[in-house]
Amino acid sequence: MRHYEIVFMVHPDQSEQVPGMIERYTAAITGAEGKIHRLEDWGRRQLAYPINKLHKAHYVLMNVEAPQEVIDELETTFRFNDAVIRSMVMRTKHAVTEASPMVKAKDERRERRDDFANETADDAEAGDSEE
């Protein structure tokens, strides 16, 4: 089986359907003896340019190992699903399991925010004890 990176963008009005779509696609892959190495739901993001007069879309990234028949089926599903604005399936040489730069940046921002909140809480406690 080959390794693939799949990115698809969903219409922003259909964002509530994304978990169900992910579940269906992962079930199709695992049902055909495939493996999912990475699954990231990036959420609703700004598009670089308008697509069908839309400025935002819900992004999903999947790195999978699957037979060609399943990938063909997924591409057909993407093509005929009106909620999917764009999709891209790329073959990769090996499985990608580490977090994408999008998720890494989000985690770093969260860590910095938590560190800042802890520092301000410590400063407030230190100020209270001095008085």
From Swiss-Prot:
Source domain of life: Bacteria
Record key words, sorted: Acetylation, Ribonucleoprotein, Ribosomal protein, RNA-binding, rRNA-binding
InterPro entries per the UniProt record, alphabetical: Ribosomal_bS6 (IPR000529), Ribosomal_bS6_CS (IPR020815), Ribosomal_bS6_sf (IPR035980), Ribosomal_S6_plastid/chlpt (IPR020814), Transl_elong_EF1B/ribsomal_bS6 (IPR014717)
Transmembrane among keywords: no
Keyword DNA-binding: no
Residue numbers bearing the N6-acetyllysine modification: 93
Pfam families: Ribosomal_S6
Biased composition (Basic and acidic residues): 104-116
GO molecular function: small ribosomal subunit rRNA binding; structural constituent of ribosome
CC annotations in GO: cytosolic small ribosomal subunit
One GO term of the biological process aspect: translation
Region named Disordered: 98-131
PROSITE patterns: RIBOSOMAL_S6
Comp. bias (Acidic residues): 120-131
Family per similarity comment: Belongs to the bacterial ribosomal protein bS6 family.
Its job: Binds together with bS18 to 16S ribosomal RNA.
Protein name per the record: Small ribosomal subunit protein bS6
The species this protein was found in: Escherichia coli O1:K1 / APEC
